[in-house]
Structure formats: C-alpha cells, structure tokens
C-alpha cells in the first residue's frame, strides 16, 4: 500500500468508526485538538504531563495540543456536564512531538453490561473494518497492588522493580516468599489462578477479574494474561484495565480502563 492508499484507508477507518457507533446509538463528539488550559485548575498530575505535551502561551492564556482523549473529555464534562452515557470519538493525539489518530469510546456511569457490550462492538468493528482480530488479552486491576503490598513498601524503587519485573531485586527487598515474587515467577497465563492463593476470594479486584475472565472465555478468548505490574497513568484510574492485542497487526492494541475522578467512566481506545 503506497502513502496515498494508506491515507485513504486511515480516513475511511475513521469515518467507518463514527458511522458504526452512530448506528449503535453512541453520541458522536468532536473536540478541538488544541486545549485551552487554566494554570490555576491544573493539578500536580496535569503539570507532570506537560513534559510530553506541546503547549504555549498567548496573551496570558495557556494552550496545549491534546495528548489524551479521556483526559480531555473528563476535564470538559466536569465543567459542562453531559446527559450522554456513551460517546464515540476520532481524532489526533500528540505525545512527545509524535502525532497519531485515535478512535475510542467512553462509557459514563458505566455498568458492567454496558462496558462489555462496548468492547464487543469495538472488536466487531476491528473484525469487519480493519480485517483483524484479538489474538490475546491482558487483564489487570489497579487495586491489586494495595492488596499484595503494604503501603510502607510501595517506595519508588520497589514500584520500579515491580514494573520492570526485576525478580532478583524484589527478592532482596521483599523476600522469596512474598506474594508478588511468587506470582511474578509464574507464567502470566497462570497468574490469575495463583493470585487466588494470596488475596481473599471476595476481594473486589479478584471478583471483577474473575467475572471478566469468564465473560472473555464465553466470547471465545482463551489466551488471557494477568498483569500485576502496571501502575495507573493517572490517579483516577482505580479499577480494572484491559489490553486486547491484535493477531495480524501486532503493533495495535485496544486498551481500556475504569476511572473515577470528577466523573466515573470506562474508556476504550485504539491508535490507528
């Protein structure tokens, strides 16, 4: 496919996405790639993100190029509440001076059934329009770390070693028998079963992970991995997250996660 054909295919995929989810009764939203920001309203995490954002000042006003749709929509709907419970979007995101096209969905005040239906529809779009399918799925939950590791041990060094899966370092700091070390020693496909030995069966994170595992099995996805190493990109990500890796285009990953800040939601996004 030459450059012109790739450009046409990309634009067609964007349009097809909007048509598909408009037909499924999602509200279509279109926000400017340029965000107008108020320094007084930016929190510590917002300021930390500025390192990857392109921003400038004009007449005492700060402007920045969009780097995250979920964050932009959450910020906007916190100021201007919407009655919509499910929205669909397409557009550019710019991170570290690199631009990409993203398509995605947001479910507000989400129920499990609505989120799973959104994921099901998203995968159907991938199959029909992108001619691809999900090869394997990664599940995780941002409450797992607190369930497995005492707060006093959640130091930057230890968190970094968990993220890097540095077993030798973790053994030194935590011990060989520590639950995190024992879980990470297992194949990621087995870790969800191993997890049951280290946290109560009625722990909300484990219950939710098991519900999703059963649902994914019913959809025909058997290759499911657990990730206990991921740490939330923003503090409002407090629940389950999912990554659906593609069979044909291995660079593409459909990602999603639950968040609760000024608004509660579950977002799903794919970079084309």
From Swiss-Prot:
Entry GO terms, CC: cytoplasm
Record HAMAP family: HisZ
Source species: Staphylococcus aureus (strain NCTC 8325 / PS 47)
Listed pathway(s): Amino-acid biosynthesis; L-histidine biosynthesis; L-histidine from 5-phospho-alpha-D-ribose 1-diphosphate: step 1/9
Domain of life: Bacteria
Function description: Required for the first step of histidine biosynthesis. May allow the feedback regulation of ATP phosphoribosyltransferase activity by histidine.
Similarity remark: Belongs to the class-II aminoacyl-tRNA synthetase family. HisZ subfamily.
More info: This function is generally fulfilled by the C-terminal part of HisG, which is missing in some bacteria such as this one.
A Pfam family hit: tRNA-synt_His
Classification of source organism: Bacteria, Bacillati, Bacillota, Bacilli, Bacillales
Name listed for the protein in its UniProt record: ATP phosphoribosyltransferase regulatory subunit
Keywords of this entry: Amino-acid biosynthesis, Cytoplasm, Histidine biosynthesis
